[in-house]
């Protein structure tokens, strides 16, 4: 992702065809070392392509991917209906998650009561 971001920065900065050196310079300015193999792959894949078209294609792919918990909830509901004992382990998992969250919250102040 860092290589794509640096490539986009170079293109948006006016360099229509950034070289590996250009990308390394951008990444180096924020302290990131570039791996030549990955860098060359990104440059090879994006070279000569219109960035706006690449971004539009990416948005199209992302919009077609399912996101959120709707699919997981439907799958979980079907499993509980199919197996009568499927609901008990789920309840145990929820209890464990709540317990872990409360332990994490108690560690937030690390023993220092700033407002006590």
Swiss-Prot record:
Record's GO cellular component terms: cytosolic large ribosomal subunit
GO molecular-function term, one example from the UniProt record: structural constituent of ribosome
Pfam family, one: Ribosomal_60s
This protein's UniProt keywords: Phosphoprotein, Ribonucleoprotein, Ribosomal protein
InterPro entries assigned to the protein according to its UniProt record, in alphabetical order: P1/P2_N_sf (IPR038716), Ribosomal_P1/P2 (IPR027534), Ribosomal_P2 (IPR044076)
A GO biological process held by the record: cytoplasmic translational elongation
PTM summary: Phosphorylated.
Domain of life of the native organism: Eukaryota
Biased composition (Basic and acidic residues): 91-101
Assembly information from the UniProt record: P1 and P2 exist as dimers at the large ribosomal subunit.
Protein family according to the UniProt entry: Belongs to the eukaryotic ribosomal protein P1/P2 family.
Protein's name in the database: Large ribosomal subunit protein P2
Protein source organism: Branchiostoma floridae
């Amino acid at each position: 992702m860092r290589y794509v971001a640096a490539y986009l920065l170079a293109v948006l900065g006016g360099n229509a065809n950034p070289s590996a050196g250009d990308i390394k310079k951008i990444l180096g300015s924020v302290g990131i070392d570039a791996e030549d193999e990955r860098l060359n792959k990104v440059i090879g894949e994006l070279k000569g392509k219109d960035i706006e078209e690449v971004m539009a294609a990416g948005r199209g792919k992302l919009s077609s991917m399912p996101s959120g918990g709707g699919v997981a909830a439907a799958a979980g509901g079907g499993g509980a209906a199919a197996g009568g004992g499927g609901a008990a382990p789920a309840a145990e998992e929820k209890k464990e998650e709540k317990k872990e969250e409360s332990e994490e919250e108690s560690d937030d102040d690390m023993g220092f009561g700033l407002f006590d």
